[in-house]
Amino acid sequence: MSSHPIQVFSEIGKLKKVMLHRPGKELENLLPDYLERLLFDDIPFLEDAQKEHDAFAQALRDEGIEVLYLEQLAAESLTSPEIRDQFIEEYLDEANIRDRQTKVAIRELLHGIKDNQELVEKTMAGIQKVELPEIPDEAKDLTDLVESEYPFAIDPMPNLYFTRDPFATIGNAVSLNHMFADTRNRETLYGKYIFKYHPIYGGKVDLVYNREEDTRIEGGDELVLSKDVLAVGISQRTDAASIEKLLVNIFKKNVGFKKVLAFEFANNRKFMHLDTVFTMVDYDKFTIHPEIEGDLHVYSVTYENEKLKIVEEKGDLAELLAQNLGVEKVHLIRCGGGNIVAAAREQWNDGSNTLTIAPGVVVVYDRNTVTNKILEEYGLRLIKIRGSELVRGRGGPRCMSMPFEREEV
């Protein structure tokens, strides 16, 4: 194994190191009237969500996996007063603060927080207007008057516990993503600082995509099938143009991959990412949501003579995967056993969104009983976690984790 700080050349190699984010006060800033704006369907109960997340982290540690936390890595990246000040200014610039007085007050509030991790967690939680000095009526501008009912000076980032999406580890490199919605795109700022300034990761990891790009891509659509083959999803959250940029960079930087399988499927919230409908759980086994199979289009992409070569694959998906992975046969394990009711219910509760921590060893939500039973019948060992509150954000174990190091397979 190389000493490189990022080592992810598969979806199934034994997981050695992973990054999570423990849900924080950002969840307590979710309001019913603004759920759609913040990409949520419901409001998790923070205390129970934290208990569930702590149990998830402990289950990983029990398997010998080192657990890192986004909030700690980001705090450790603020290695000088100058970098700390720069972080605050970038955070303010990206927060869409419309009037100067509010921005000045927030800057003062943030500079008053001396502990780096407390500062990072405050930027994640968002800032309510009531935390700031009252602006006198005669000093209010039109924006203040028009938006007087909106409670936040800066929106919270409640999706942060889905660490899979703001950036993706690919081989020894990282795709620092430009995300689908403004409310999530601000999350990528933490990855920028980690991979630029962190004592271990800063300046040591190639970027194969950058958050300054103007087209969208998210980590839930980026899967590392093997040291030679990637899978990417063309989805609600990821543009085909972004995939082309990513692939050109991967091939030009010689990250090590020879081919990409691009999956085009239904563009809607319930199938927001490829990993909500398709994950790899063993050398020759994948979970899949049966509802995507009819409309699925797969394209093979290679890089020849300084340009991308794209071929639409017309054959059977299992045969295509077997051919590209060098195995005799691939088993597609259908969420809900293919039963239309069970499949729809369990896919909504992330029955297809599994985290493989070693070949045939998979972390799942315990609530998806039909799918879990079928996975066990295929010989997989399941590590079942509770997710009654975590699942309200529409993400499962893979969504909640970003591998930093896996053993080679």
UniProtKB/Swiss-Prot annotation:
It catalyses: L-arginine + H2O = L-citrulline + NH4(+). It is found in: Cytoplasm. Pathway: Amino-acid degradation; L-arginine degradation via ADI pathway; carbamoyl phosphate from L-arginine: step 1/2. Keywords: Arginine metabolism, Cytoplasm, Hydrolase. Belongs to the arginine deiminase family. The lineage of its organism: Bacteria, Bacillati, Bacillota, Bacilli, Lactobacillales. NCBIfam families: arcA, PRK01388.1. This is Arginine deiminase. One of its GO terms (cellular component) is cytoplasm. The active site is at C399. It comes from Streptococcus pneumoniae serotype 4 (strain ATCC BAA-334 / TIGR4). InterPro entries: Arg_deiminase. Its EC number is 3.5.3.6. Pfam families: ADI. GO terms for molecular function: arginine deiminase activity. GO terms for biological process: arginine catabolic process to ornithine; arginine deiminase pathway.
